Amino acid sequence: LRQQADKPKGQPNFSLADFVAPKESGRVDYVGGFACTAGPEVHDLARHFEEKHDDYSALIVKALGDRFAEAFAERLHKWARDQWEFGLTENLTSEEIIREKYRGIRPAPGYPACPDHTEKWELFKLLDATNHTGISLTESLAMFPASSVSGLYFAHPEAKYFAVGKLDRDQIHDYATRKNMEPTEAERWLRPYLNYDPDSVLTKPCLPGAKVESMV
């Protein structure tokens, strides 16, 4: 998916694909994947407090669980950078790590740079994530346990976070074709990002010979 908003001259419309060497370049490049969790114990302990009507303690447990999962993801990212070797020369303070001053990014499906939650299906398949971590995906593609993180590692020195923003019908249909998915299915998962109303007859593509009458 690529940004489609009009930008000032000289400013590119980003896609995460920009940070991976194209196949035709002949260059060897890699993208990493990860999935980690603070474990089911976070859910169980929070449930324990909820059953005792101690909502405050339940909230604290969930918040700590989320922080542990994010810290785990941060540690895994450091390990990945070390495997790529450029991380071995890092000498960052805790504040610089929090501000993500290192090289590379780790976007997650469902977030602004990669808004399609269905990418988790392929990621979990490649990692065999459920067997290795115990993390499962719900029907809405949320992760369970909730204190879990998954995503991709990009090593490109100019990789940056961005928001894809609103998407037009042409890109949605092209994207659906490349994912071997029905356009209506892609629209369902990406609905918050659509720059059109998929239910409106005025925005639906017409078949040859079809007529659209104005309702104004």
Kindly label every feature range from the protein language model.
Residues 1-59, 63, 81, 86-88, ...:
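Active-site loops and adjacent core secondary-structure elements that bind or stabilize anionic groups
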Residues 64-66, 70-79:
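Acidic, metal/cofactor-coordinating or nucleic-acid-engaging core segments within structured domains
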Residues 78-177, 183-184, 188-191, 202:
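Compositionally biased, low-complexity/repeat regions
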Residues 181-183, 187, 196-216:
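Acidic, low-complexity intrinsically disordered tails
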